[in-house]
Amino acid sequence: MTIQYTFSMIKPDAIKRNKIGQVNTYLENAGLKIVAQKMKFLTKYEAACFYDEHRARPFFNSLVEYITSGAVVLQVLKGEDAITLNRTVMGATNPAEAEAGTIRKDLGESIEANSIHGSDSENSAKREIAFFFNKSEIIE
């Protein structure tokens, strides 16, 4: 097993429903350590740059609108195989298809408003962490 860092974003739907603590409990109970965390409102420009890989997809504009509709909580998580572990704890993108006991099944409302985003690979994790955090903000 390898110690990894991964990126997580608690989305506006979960923030509006006061679920930050609940999401963090899922993450920590799974063995992930939150080593950086901050809340912010993303600008449309930041959101478009962050989700640039989806720019040509039909849902891109609605994704940018949604993710800028309220505050988000940005996080760096650390743990053994953190990327895979975080993906497992999050559950399937569509809450209706996610397994019971996952964040998206228990807290998600729809495919878009599914409460959480997480990196899907090492390259994505590195890019997404660097997009929002500098090294001095990450506590070991």
UniProtKB/Swiss-Prot annotation:
ATP binds at K11, F59, R87, T93, R104, N114. One of its GO terms (molecular function) is ATP binding. PROSITE patterns: NDPK, NDPK_LIKE. SMART domains: NDK. InterPro entries: NDK-like_dom, NDK-like_dom_sf, Nucleoside_diP_kinase, Nucleoside_diP_kinase_AS. It catalyses: a 2'-deoxyribonucleoside 5'-diphosphate + ATP = a 2'-deoxyribonucleoside 5'-triphosphate + ADP; a ribonucleoside 5'-diphosphate + ATP = a ribonucleoside 5'-triphosphate + ADP. Signal peptide: none annotated. The active site is at H117 (pros-phosphohistidine intermediate). The keyword Nucleus does not apply. GO terms for cellular component: cytoplasm. Its cofactor is Mg(2+). Keywords: ATP-binding, Cytoplasm, Kinase, Magnesium, Metal-binding, Nucleotide metabolism, Nucleotide-binding, Phosphoprotein, Transferase. GO terms for biological process: CTP biosynthetic process; GTP biosynthetic process; UTP biosynthetic process. Its EC number is 2.7.4.6. It is found in: Cytoplasm. It comes from the Bacteria. The keyword Nucleotide-binding applies. Homotetramer. NCBIfam families: PRK00668.1 (NF001908). Belongs to the NDK family. Major role in the synthesis of nucleoside triphosphates other than ATP. The ATP gamma phosphate is transferred to the NDP beta phosphate via a ping-pong mechanism, using a phosphorylated active-site intermediate. This is Nucleoside diphosphate kinase. It comes from Rickettsia peacockii (strain Rustic). The lineage of its organism: Bacteria, Pseudomonadati, Pseudomonadota, Alphaproteobacteria, Rickettsiales.
